[in-house]
Amino acid sequence: MKGVSKVYGTLHALSDINLTVNAGDWLSIMGPSGSGKTTMINLIGCMDSPSSGSVVLDGHDISRESAASLTRIRRDKIGLIFQQFHLISYLTAVENIMVAQYYHSMPDEGEALEALEKVGLGDRARHLPSQLSGGEQQRVCIARALINSPDILLGDEPTGNLDEENEGIVIDILRTLHREGATIIVVTHDPEVGDVAQRKIVLEYGKIVQDIDQTRPLEPKENGGRA
């Protein structure tokens, strides 16, 4: 993102944002409601275009791309996980994933089953959403997001509706994906989710007010504590 601003009428959702995320990074985006977090993830995910500035994704400046091109980039390069599960109630877990495969023109039940195995739900493949817990439904959504082998995995409050146990399971899945080389960008209100990322930015009133490298050790205080 280079000098990115996004304006809706009189609302300045983002103001002059400069942000670089490298391949393989894990970034968390935090901040109060209305600070611009979801707007930022929508721009990165090619679901919206900036009012000014440029968003460059794998060499593509999305502000200059056509709607058809943005759809293709989103289909080929991005996996999306939302707070709401958006599963089709009358389809099984594996069928919900295969619906996403049709979008990517690659229906393959074997690959859909493999994606469910990856998130620990191989034995739930034939279950309907109503037969799954909230945590299991979110894991189906993660499997669905992975089906096109995306370059970037984007999450907008992916643990927002989960209890502590299922939140931990989802975080562990994200850790595994990151170790395998995935680029992960997650919007969250939850400090525990935000703190597991390599890097954390905090937004306020559409501006980045903190940019924290969380891979660096904390400086020891003089009394022996940690800064």
In which residue ranges do the predicted regions lie?
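Conserved beta-strand-loop-alpha-helix hinge in the C-terminal portion
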Residues: K207-A227
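ABC family nucleotide-binding domain
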Residues: K2-Y205
